[in-house]
Regions:
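A basic, amphipathic helix-loop patch mediating RNA/tRNA/ribosome contacts
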Residues: 32-85, 118
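Conserved class I S-adenosyl-L-methionine
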Residues: 116-123
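Conserved S-adenosyl-L-methionine
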Residues: 135-140
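S-adenosyl-L-methionine
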Residues: 148-179
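A short glycine-rich, Lys/Arg-flanked "PGG" loop and its adjoining helix->strand segment in the class I
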Residues: 198-206
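Conserved beta-strand signature within the Rossmann-like core of class I S-adenosyl-L-methionine
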Residues: 207-214
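Short, glycine-/aromatic-enriched active-site segment of Class I SAM-dependent methyltransferases
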Residues: 216-234
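Core SAM-dependent methyltransferase catalytic element
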Residues: 265-281
Length: 281
C-alpha cells in the first residue's frame, strides 16, 4: 500500500508540472501553444509584447522578413518561441498602415509643406494618410470613410482627428466640414477619382491642395481591368489613365496639375499606383 501511495503522489506531482496546451481548433491545426510560461506562437508573442496590434499584422511582418529572433530572421508566424526570446523588428512601421508610406513619399517628392493645415482624408480606412499628415504637423484632419470601425485606435483618440464614419465622400459639402479646408488627400477604392474629386474640390479654399492616389484598376474600363483580373500591368494603359485624369482635372475642374509621382510600393494586388498633386486657384 505504501508503494502505491508514493507512486500516486509522484504522478500527481508530475502532472502539476505539465504545462497546459491550448489549440485554436480544426481551422488552424498547427496553432497550438503552451501557456504556463513556456513556448507560444511567434505571432502571439509579438502581439503580447506590443510589437503589433493584431496577430494578422504580426503574421504579415514575419512573412515580409521584418522580424528577427536572436538576430536570425523568422520565417514562420506559427513558430514556437520562448516568451523571453530576444525579438527585434528590422524596421518599425512609421505609420498605422502602408498608405502612410505612399503619402509621405509624395509629400517629400513634391516638397509640399502641410504644417498647420486643416485637412480632410477621403477614404481614411485604417488611417495611414491621416497618420502621415499628423506626423507632418497638420492642425486637424477630418477622417472620412464610408465604412465603420476601421480607423486605428491611436488616431480615433487623437483630439486633432474628427472621425466621420459611414460617410460617403461623394455627398460631402461645406456644411459637413466646419472651417476652411486647405488640403484634401484621397485614397478611395472601387470608384474613379472622376466621381470623388468634383465634390472634394468644392470643399477646398482658394489655393488649397489635393494629393490623390491613382489606382489604375478603378480608373480603367471594365474590359481592361478584367483582362488582368483587376491588375493593370500595361504601361500604355497607365499613360492613358493619367492623360485622361489630367484632362479632366484641368479642363473640367479647373485645377492646376502640379505634378505626379509613382507610389514607392505596389497596391495590395500588385497594382502600380501613382500620386497626383492638384491645386485650386
Amino acid at each position: 500500500m505504501g508503494l502505491k501511495k508514493n507512486m500516486a503522489q509522484r504522478m500527481i506531482h508530475v502532472k502539476e508540472h505539465i504545462p497546459r496546451i491550448h489549440c485554436t481548433g480544426a481551422r488552424e491545426p498547427l496553432s497550438c501553444f503552451v501557456v504556463n510560461g513556456h513556448r507560444k506562437r511567434l505571432d502571439q508573442i509579438l502581439v503580447d509584447r506590443g510589437f503589433f496590434g493584431s496577430r494578422e499584422r504580426a503574421k504579415r511582418a514575419v512573412m515580409a522578413g521584418q522580424v528577427m529572433i536572436e538576430d536570425q530572421p523568422a520565417t514562420k508566424p506559427g513558430q514556437q518561441v520562448r516568451p523571453d526570446a530576444n525579438l527585434k523588428l528590422k524596421e518599425q512601421d512609421p505609420f498605422v498602415s502602408r498608405g502612410g508610406l505612399k503619402l509621405d513619399h509624395a509629400l517629400e517628392h513634391f516638397k509640399l509643406n502641410v504644417q498647420d493645415a486643416m485637412a480632410a482624408d477621403l477614404g481614411a480606412s485604417t488611417g495611414g494618410f491621416t497618420d502621415c499628415l499628423l506626423q507632418r504637423g497638420v492642425s486637424k484632419v477630418f477622417a472620412i470613410d464610408v465604412g465603420q470601425g476601421q480607423l486605428a485606435w491611436k488616431l480615433r483618440t487623437d483630439n486633432r482627428v474628427v472621425v466621420m464614419e459611414k460617410t460617403n465622400a461623394r455627398h460631402l459639402n461645406k456644411k459637413h466640414l466646419p472651417g476652411e479646408i486647405d488640403l484634401i488627400v484621397v485614397d478611395c477604392s472601387f470608384i474613379s477619382l472622376k466621381h470623388i474629386l468634383p465634390p472634394a474640390v468644392a470643399l477646398l479654399e482658394r489655393d488649397g491642395n489635393v494629393v490623390a492616389l491613382i489606382k489604375p484598376q478603378f480608373e480603367a474600363g471594365k474590359e481592361e481591368a478584367d483582362k488582368g483580373r483587376g491588375v493593370i500591368r500595361d504601361p500604355n494603359i497607365h499613360d492613358q489613365i493619367i492623360h485622361s485624369l489630367h484632362q479632366f482635372t484641368t479642363e473640367e475642374l479647373g485645377l492646376n496639375w502640379k505634378g505626379i509621382v509613382e507610389s514607392p510600393i505596389l497596391g495590395p494586388a500588385g497594382n502600380k499606383e501613382f500620386l497626383v498633386w492638384l491645386e485650386k486657384y
